Amino acid sequence: MNAVDTQYLEKHTPMMRQYLTLKAETPDMLLFYRMGDFYELFYDDAKRASELLGISLTARGKSGGDPIPMAGIPYHAVEGYLAKLVQLRVSVAICEQIGDPATTKGPVERKIVRIVTPGTLTDEALLQERQDNLLAAVYHGKVGFGYATLDVSSGRFVVTELASKEALEAELQRTNPAELLYSEDFSEPALIASLSGKRRRPEWEFDYDTSYKLLLEQFGTKDLYGFGLGEVRLSLQAAGCLIQYVKDTQRTALPHINAITRFNQCDSIVLDAATRKNLELTRNLQGGSDNTLASVLDNTATPMGSRMLQRWIHEPLRNHNIIRARHDAIDELLDNGYHESLHEQLKALGDIERITARLAIRSARPRDFARLRQALALLPEIQQQLADCNSPHLKALSSHLGDFPEEHALLSRAIVDNPPMLIRDGGVIKEGYHNELDEWRKLSQGATDYLAELEAREKAATGASTLKVGYNRVHGYYIEVSRRESDLVPMSYQRRQTLKNTERYIVAELKEHEEKVLSSQGKALALEKQLWEELFDLLMPRLHELQAFARAAAELDVITNFAERAEQLDYHRPELTAQSGIHIEAGRHPVVERVSQTPFIANPVSLNPARRMLIVTGPNMGGKSTYMRQVALITLMAHIGSFVPAQKAAIGPVDRIFTRIGAADDLASGRSTFMVEMTETANILHNATPESLVLMDEIGRGTSTYDGLSLAWSAAEHLAQNLKSMTLFATHYFELTQLPDQMENVANVHLDAIEHDDTIAFMHAVQEGAASKSYGLQVAALAGVPAKVVQAAKHKLHHLESRDREEELPELRQAQLSMTMPETSKALDRLDTIDPDSLTPRQALDLLYELKQLR
């Protein structure tokens, strides 16, 4: 705990001294300080909460001579305010009264009982149902980065080692953490500058020995080799920080975090940050979820299935055996039609994954247990259907679903059919589960029946027709009579309260009854809470099996969903081959075909060792980018185990998918559009291999014509001749269509259009050969460019086309020639003979003048 200056505390009242001491425990979080029926915030917390939540900012007297800013929220509405703060990536410490005001002199004892941070949420009301909520930590070593993620709401704990800044950037985009922990001396702040929910942690929390010890304690093992974590030092340092942080915030045991896995990038097709963004896998270019691959593929029955599907989309596999097992399972579900009934059964399971996590940390609510009971009741039906399947994958999933007859029987006996949301007010434990509880409830209910008898008797005795017996928390039980009949009440009635139109009284008999009722109700509620806690103890021994059940059910949901999507959207099974290349017949863009107002034109693609690169030409709006993206998306879909939008697809080994499509200024990093484009191009040229799929769209547009053409030509030449990557290269530089004449593994394809007078119709059909023209003026007219401007452009175009190209573009031809000829220079030859480390400043200056004369 951070120390609080003693002299400073002495200036304040006892209550504010208590508040400031508690606030020092969590100085970087808002402190919700419980006072009666409100959570109060003071000082800067009050100002900040007022601004963030739109609540009134007031003052509470003075302490230390100054007015104390104050804001408050009702305790019963706290979840709504917490949800808003979590969305804003703001953390909150919740302080409750734990002492008894009746027996306490001075401030009631309080302590922080709960800490809510964006990355450690488990409460259903605070979580996005169909999105993972990850806490992450990153540690920068001398060579590379260690990265760890933990989903506290499921127990999923993953680490990975990353060799470069680019790899870390891609991993941050893939995992999209809600909260990121990093060390105080993290040396690459620019990498995480745009992330919200960052939290700096002291360097000692990343200490290797401390981290290793924490992990051993958490998993109850002697070493971590059984998890495959023998040589991942940096990521273990990040993982240790996560465990420490979660223990600090949750303040309870975490038995559901019982394993840790390593994410090996070599097991998956590598997607860099630009590719994940450009392909709009789970988020579109505007940051939303509409019109993404996930929005089309996700018709899952359960939230946990939806979250797993999104993880699969970001982790396309390279292991063909695992993928084929998924394809076989889909085939069988389609053949026997089980996917429809399984979908309905799975829909009733709910979110067992997160319910199990709340069970583990003892924060589950009554309705969680009711949903768990329902899920366990459905298991035999699901397993009965899967018993008839031959797919090894479906059989394995069925066995992992488990068997829980005793747990189902327990919950059926213990929990009422429709429990309330909270245990706080009782009414959760079913009648017949516990004899003593039933007795206290009967006593309480019998006392309630007595009130009706008392009311009838007193009405008859007094003759007051308005007489009734009531109850409130302030005055307890009372007899109420209208003021016009108050003269009818006997002397034995003691006036308790006068209202506008009524008088309220108590009698000795009613007071005795009140004590009896409150005693029986209190004892019943206390016993019910005790029995509720015992249910956690009875279910906890099956925690690991329940987690396995949740994982298997989620995967079964995804596979069933793939079968349903294949049937509804006319997807077909792709063939995964050992031969290099991608061959697709009648391929379609999975998203565009769903939102297009006109029938989608299917197109083929053929890439193989003799045809490594396609130069794609055609008009703007002709469909070049859509065509390229659909090839990448079909390839990715095949590798997550889905069927694909194509009549036929045969896809060989793929290690990476790169995209260089579109660009915008990166203002945060001070990079222009062209700089962003060149950075992405450089990444591709450094890392692409013969098994990489590369999409290059219009590179070189952000600079002069000659510079742009030179860069585009050289990049295409390098990809085709040296890297031999499978490449789709879209361009408006028609000079690039000459590449197939110089390189055997390059071919031209184009998307055509038809002109009629001044209009243009885009055919969207891919054809062999180069496009004849770009149709730029027609597209400008369609875009609404004023007719006068378009007409003037036509005149200028005719003028330029009529000029002698031999006179007009000599530099361009020279630029093209230089791309294919080695550059020689006396200055370069002289530079090759120089050792720069041995030069004195004077020698370096003399050499500079010498080189200037040689250029």
UniProtKB/Swiss-Prot annotation:
Among InterPro entries, the record links this protein to: DNA_mismatch_repair_MutS, DNA_mismatch_repair_MutS-lik_N, DNA_mismatch_repair_MutS/MSH, DNA_mismatch_repair_MutS_C, DNA_mismatch_repair_MutS_clamp, DNA_mismatch_repair_MutS_core, DNA_mismatch_repair_MutS_N, DNA_mismatch_repair_MutS_sf
Q: Does the keyword ATP-binding apply?
A: yes
Ligand binding (ATP) = 618-625
- Family matches, as SMART domains: MUTSac, MUTSd
> What would be an example GO MF term here?
ATP binding
PROSITE patterns, per the entry: DNA_MISMATCH_REPAIR_2
Keywords per UniProt: ATP-binding, DNA damage, DNA repair, DNA-binding, Nucleotide-binding
Q: Which GO terms describe its cellular component?
A: cytosol
**GO biological process annotations for this chain's record?**
mismatch repair
Pfam family, any one = MutS_I
Q: Which family does it belong to?
A: Belongs to the DNA mismatch repair MutS family.
Q: What's this protein's function?
A: This protein is involved in the repair of mismatches in DNA. It is possible that it carries out the mismatch recognition step. This protein has a weak ATPase activity.
What's this protein's name?
DNA mismatch repair protein MutS
